[in-house]
Amino acid sequence: MGKLITAILLLLSFSANAQMNFCTNDLDSYPTRSGGRIKPLYVLATDTIKFITGESKVDDLSATEAFCKLSLKAFGMPLELPVMVRVDHVDVKKILGIKDSEHSIAVNEALTKMSILDTELAKTKENNSYKKEITKVKQRLEAYTAIVEARLWTVPIAKENDIEFISLGEFLTETRIAVVREKSDNPVNFLFAEAKDQFLKVKGDGYLLELRYFKMNLFMWAMMATLIAIAFLVAMKNKWPGAIFTAITIGLQLTAITMRVMISGRGPVTNMYETVMFSGAGALVIACIITLFRKEVAFVIAGLCFNILSLLMMKFANGMLDAGISPLVPVLRDNFWLSTHVTTIILSYAALALSWVVANALMIRDRFSKVSSAEYRYGVDLVYTCMKFGVVLLAAGIILGGVWADYSWGRFWGWDPKETWSLIVLLVYMAILHGKSTTWIPP
């Protein structure tokens, strides 16, 4: 009965004009809590809509507008949006009755087939790609249900000089709306504005850094600067224009990484997205450092090439990489060791990736054009220079990892798979470098 009265009050509160003025992109900056931290509504809406549909929009609506309108369905608002649920696995498409050429199913149709997904999930014992896709589709449907039941969107309320977050369903109650109707013709807008003001007084607007981080899209600008830098360094004898755009690229990426660190409060190396991000920028910085000593622009070009590959992965490999900022798993909740051991290891990946780029460029050049023996030996020397940096960083990272293990678990080395294989990799690279410095590997 209470929900019915609330729905009626909401319908009265939302004239056609007011409804249009509420669910707008002005809500992008609204504070909400999800995944254990405070973030702008824009981030929650974009991540959730993209997770459900694979797109950042629903029809012509932005993620924030669609998220808002879907959330108001819980209160009887007459809103119908063509939400499509992403389905990628061909066998999951079959059980849901989707053509192989299609990549999504209408959410209302998918909800009627939830029992089919549950049955298939129970039948499938092996944790293969089929089972993972069923689980993911179920999670998408559960996320949609949480939105339309007004459970996912949380709203701040002041409580004893602090802020708590409650679900939208708990926030828009009959009592609150009835009280505020005496103060404003648009009680819902008034309630939300009042809650935001109270939040800003207590917590401030530091959470808006995340909104600026995503809106500025610095990695896209860095991608463009990287392409221009490569073109200038390859095509022009005067290397200064390329050097300037290389510096711009580094500046953009370091700014973006710094913002991400400030938002998360930890080192930017906790998942695959951040590994790709940090290794790409790290490779370019290491390439510039090596160039200062060797005076060879090929290192910078190699760093830019690996960097553009990393940026392309970050932009387009959405199925593999998640750009979201998530809380740390318990084993990584030590910011000092995370910022030393893990960053050192990833910088070693970056240096070794430079050797990979230089070596492949040398082989391709040798395959399609004549490379003199002197040029070939010089190219090989560039490869080994990158490897030396990588091996030093890898060794340092492994030692730091052992110290962290001793600090956390009371033992320096336990021969678990990660420790064993990291040592194998280090020994292989050390054998190659040793062979090059002796007579094992000919010049």
Where are these regions (language model features)?
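Membrane-interface interhelical loops and short amphipathic "cap" helices
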Residues: A195-F214, T255-V276, G319-T343, S372-E375, ...
